[in-house]
């Protein structure tokens, strides 16, 4: 079973969302294998379909002054924060990896992060009510998935060295009685994404049962607007398929960030 992965560096939420849509179309058509994207976002607050504006506790002027983007998207779930120091993993996987079971998929994703955190002696686990990965009563990683035609997008956000004060701007995932934490806070020392990425990748591959894991490069078909880091590049024209099909082809896919799990074609797993 083959897995491709790519470290995208820092990438805007909108560009990452568009990239996932494109890759999902390619995965649905069988043009690429399961693909794992590792990245971090500039400061952004995302609002799912069940999000309440009251769960954003800072006014728009205050957010803008802090360089925080606000994006309303069509996934399930409520309000979530992403920012520097947070390892984000997006999984463009076919559900055949878990015999079609979304619950099994979520369980394995949580298990991946629990095992990864154990490398640093962090005892993480599951919450009896809320989704995600927790250390005691504090959440260290949020999960959120969308499924279309048996192919997933979205994934997890793990707080590595995240500025936790940013979570005071929102009610994270609508949970008012739970705190948030990070690896850096627990360990009381600096932790980098560079340290954490390979461990998460290894645990993901082992937990999901991939036997062949290989890196893949993303080549923008358009000229970057400013050059430099990949985060400054336009990601609207990308293809991960192999050499026999090098040209990018936009595969039309409908928006699938629908609330609830009542459609075989389009399902979502709220972020939490």
Where on the chain are the PLM-derived regions?
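Short, conserved beta-strand/beta-arch hydrophobic-aromatic motifs that form part
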Residues: 56-59, 143-160
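Flexible, glycine/charged-enriched surface loops at secondary-structure junctions
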Residues: 123-125, 209-218
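N-terminal lobe of the biotin/lipoate ligase/transferase fold
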Residues: 1-135, 139-140, 191, 222-225, ...
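A hydrophobic, small-residue-rich beta->alpha segment in the mid-to-C-terminal subdomain
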Residues: 165-206
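Short, structured patches in soluble enzyme cores that scaffold and shape functional sites
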Residues: 91-93, 147, 158-162, 184-187, ...
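Generic secondary-structure signature for well-ordered alpha-helical cores
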Residues: 118, 205-209
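Coil-to-beta-strand transition motifs
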Residues: 138-140, 149-151, 162-165, 178
